[in-house]
């Protein structure tokens, strides 16, 4: 504690009377470089303030956030889309079969989606069988429609959960969020009426796996807890803390933005909506000295950069600048050589003006001489620009805009297809490209006799058929009349033959005129 007070007093003594924070701190002694792992990075303890009189220490266990917590929690899930696959077959007069497949959508139920997902992850053969289109049936001169309802599962589908109110956030949700999900029926509607989102684990629902158990020492004074020493040996004060629930667990949000599950017997107010974890909104009366305020802000930026490095598995020169020592004293320096993260022991000194460390173009003054860069890289985020200028991230000048992150993030988050606006379906057939199919029951519909004609062709054939039938009826009528006429003529001839028979003078009947004449000739002779 004495060394900390001496450090703080000496730091205050070297500052101007205006109370401004030192412009920069740079090593005046720099040890050899050695490679380190990304998980060995740490933020320097620039200021440790212990509460006066809190000398009674006792061991205790507490919960804190896991490393990598960045105010949102990744929840793995899947989407379930209801699809109706329809096969339509038509068999013409000659037996030729034409099959047409169509696809429509319907809104599935959460229970059926969970069952389909369990089939998929368990390797159930019923799921494999459901990947096929419905088997088309056919009947002669008929149209047969066969439909199969499908539950299409896409996994994984990762969304963000807000630990403060446990709401889910993703671009696939209407208005970007889903706040109506509850255990045990956890599901969210998406931008498509026929698609639901559900978490992979139905038992845990939307539980938060962001906490870790740690051991520390509680500092108290007269039975009142005023701070604690965490597992890493850093003392944290409860002064200015407020109550905050994360994932339903009560705890305290400390002044530096960290969260612990420690309970304080003193009456503590609830945090305001703008007081979030790792996001600070300090008031002037909460900070006793401007130096302390600046150190806390710089530490938070360092913690944010460290969290970003660990979660993205990516290091940039800009992020390394946050890990440097801010005040005079011993610390660490970092750089990147041959794409390898390097560390060196260093002793920092205070800098009041930039001219002290950049006396000329391209010269970074360290240990009273120009420090040589390695492929344009110095250390702590300081690089050599294309024009030969030394670029320091903290420099408040036009050169700051020229400083870019030379090492991009190597981790690309998995984005669900529905979360990409470019993949929003324009038609029913566009859902086939990236969807896996689960198909339950099959339904068949057999139509009446169908000649496979369009509506206007059908009416045209009906009209022509009517005309042909009318003509055939006329022809049939004419033929019938002619047949009747011929039959009548035959009947008339027979009656005429009967009427022309005569009787001779002898009283005998003569059947015809010729026989009568012949008989008259014989009688005369």
From Swiss-Prot:
* Disulphide bonds in the chain: none
User: Topology with regard to the membrane?
Assistant: Single-pass type I membrane protein
Q: Which residues are glycosylated?
A: 338
Q: Which residues lie on this side of the membrane: Intravirion?
A: 481-525
The UniProt Biotechnology section states that this protein is used in the following way, namely: Primary surface antigen capable of inducing and reacting with virus-neutralizing antibodies. Almost all human and veterinary vaccines are based on the functional aspects of the G protein.
Q: Which residues cross the membrane?
A: 460-480
Q: Where is this region: Disordered?
A: 505-525
Pfam families in the record, alphabetically? Answer: PH_Rhabdo_glycop, Rhabdo_glycop_CD, Rhabdo_glycop_FD
Q: What Gene3D superfamilies does the annotation carry?
A: 2.30.29.130
Sorted alphabetically, which keywords does the UniProt record give?
A: Glycoprotein, Lipoprotein, Membrane, Palmitate, Signal, Transmembrane, Transmembrane helix, Viral envelope protein, Virion
Q: Which residues form the signal peptide?
A: 1-19
Q: Where is the lipid attached (S-palmitoyl cysteine)?
A: 480
**Chief location bin:** virion
**Which residues point to the Virion surface side?**
20-459
Does the record's keyword annotation contain DNA-binding?
A: no
What is its subcellular localisation? Virion membrane
UniProt PTM comment? Glycosylated and palmitoylated by host. Glycosylation is crucial for glycoprotein export at the cell surface.
Where is it found, in Gene Ontology cellular component terms? membrane; viral envelope; virion membrane
To which protein family does this belong? Belongs to the lyssavirus glycoprotein family.
Query: What does the subunit section of this Swiss-Prot or TrEMBL entry state?
Result: Homotrimer. Interacts with matrix protein.
Q: What does this protein do?
A: Attaches the virus to host cellular receptor, inducing endocytosis of the virion. In the endosome, the acidic pH induces conformational changes in the glycoprotein trimer, which trigger fusion between virus and cell membrane. There is convincing in vitro evidence that the muscular form of the nicotinic acetylcholine receptor (nAChR), the neuronal cell adhesion molecule (NCAM), and the p75 neurotrophin receptor (p75NTR) bind glycoprotein and thereby facilitate rabies virus entry into cells.
| Record's miscellaneous remark | Arg-352 is highly involved in rabies virus pathogenicity. Its mutation dramatically attenuates the virus.
This protein is called what?
Glycoprotein
Organism, scientific name: Australian bat lyssavirus (isolate Bat/AUS/1996) (ABLV)
Give the gene name.
G
């Amino acid at each position: 504690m004495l060394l900390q007070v001496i450090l703080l007093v000496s730091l205050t003594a070297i500052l101007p009377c205006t109370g401004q924070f030192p412009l920069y701190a740079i090593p005046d002694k720099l040890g050899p470089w050695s490679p380190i792992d990304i998980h060995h990075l740490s933020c320097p303890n620039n200021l440790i303030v212990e509460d006066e009189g809190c000398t009674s220490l006792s061991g205790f266990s507490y919960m804190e956030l896991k490393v990598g917590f960045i105010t949102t929690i990744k929840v793995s899930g899947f989407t379930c889309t209801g699809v109706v696959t329809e096969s339509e077959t038509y068999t013409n007069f000659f037996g030729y079969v034409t099959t047409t497949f169509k696809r429509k959508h319907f809104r599935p139920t959460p229970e059926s989606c969970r069952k389909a997902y369990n089939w998929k992850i368990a390797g159930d053969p019923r799921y494999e069988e459901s990947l096929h289109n419905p088997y088309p049936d056919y009947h002669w001169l008929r149209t047969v429609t066969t439909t199969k309802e499908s539950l299409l599962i896409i996994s994984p589908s990762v969304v963000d959960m807000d630990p403060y109110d446990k709401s889910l956030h993703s671009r696939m949700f209407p208005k970007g969020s889903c706040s109506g999900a509850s255990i045990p029926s956890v599901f969210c509607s998406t931008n498509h009426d026929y698609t639901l989102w559900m978490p992979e684990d139905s038992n845990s629902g939307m539980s938060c796996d962001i906490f870790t158990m740690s051991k520390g020492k509680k500092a108290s004074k007269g039975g009142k807890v005023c701070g604690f020493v965490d597992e890493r040996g850093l003392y944290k004060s409860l002064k200015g803390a407020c109550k905050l629930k994360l994932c339903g667990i009560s705890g305290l949000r400390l002044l530096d933005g960290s969260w612990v599950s420690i309970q304080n017997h003193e009456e503590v107010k609830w945090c305001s909506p703008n007081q979030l974890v790792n996001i600070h909104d300090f008031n002037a009366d909460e900070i006793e000295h401007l130096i302390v305020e600046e150190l806390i802000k710089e530490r938070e930026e360092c913690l944010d950069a460290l969290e970003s490095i660990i979660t993205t598995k990516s290091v940039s020169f800009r992020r390394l600048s946050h890990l440097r020592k801010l005040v005079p004293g011993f610390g660490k320096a970092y750089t990147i050589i041959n794409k390898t993260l390097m560390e060196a022991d260093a002793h920092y000194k205070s800098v009041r003006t930039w001219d002290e460390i950049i006396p000329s173009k391209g010269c970074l003054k360290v240990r009273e001489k120009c420090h040589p860069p390695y492929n344009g890289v110095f250390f702590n985020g300081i690089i050599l620009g294309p024009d030969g200028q030394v670029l320091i991230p903290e420099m408040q000048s036009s050169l700051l805009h020229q400083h870019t992150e030379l090492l991009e993030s190597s981790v690309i988050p998995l984005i669900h297809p529905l979360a990409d606006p470019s993949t929003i379906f324009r038609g029913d057939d566009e859902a086939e490209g990236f969807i896996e199919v689960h198909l339950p029951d099959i339904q068949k519909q057999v139509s009446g006799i169908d000649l496979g004609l369009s509506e206007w062709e059908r009416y045209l054939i009906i009209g022509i058929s009517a005309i042909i039938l009318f003509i055939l009826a006329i022809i049939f009528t004419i033929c019938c009349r002619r047949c009747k006429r011929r039959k009548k003529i035959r009947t008339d001839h027979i009656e005429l033959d009967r009427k022309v028979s005569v009787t001779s003078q002898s009283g005998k009947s003569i059947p015809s005129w010729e026989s009568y004449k012949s008989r008259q000739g014989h009688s005369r002779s």
